[in-house]
């Protein structure tokens, strides 16, 4: 196990097949045409995962961040589940597909500059901050805001948006499509639209 004073960097240009890996103080950079395939990856103690344009990461179980860790995705990222703990960040610059849930309820943050597609639930909490950039999209079945801060300049589409009764805020400057909205806290509509469904 590494310590913060001797942090290492791993560059992946080929394919890394992994089963179950927990990494401390490690920067993983997946270069163009590089791939990570496996089941489970945990990043902790300021570790980072950077996926460059043209690179892929595919995990059949989950990707977990713990203790100031960061995921920067400019390629293609696919996992069944993702967990972001306190002060962890998902920076999505291209395409992230999560086939089950994204749990940031311990204070993880999401900065979306691409397409983030979660088949089931995005869970947030009071310390969480979500930013969806112009011409970008976040899609999920259920969005549990639970007191978080949400800023939307792109498109967000959910079956259910639930503020969780914990306050929080939603600043919408573009498009929010939601069938069932349980609003609470502050909802600020600025030159945008909140509608039940998107017109074809």
Model-identified regions with their sequence ranges:
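Extracellular beta-strand-rich, repetitive "passenger/adhesive" scaffolds
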Residues: 1-200
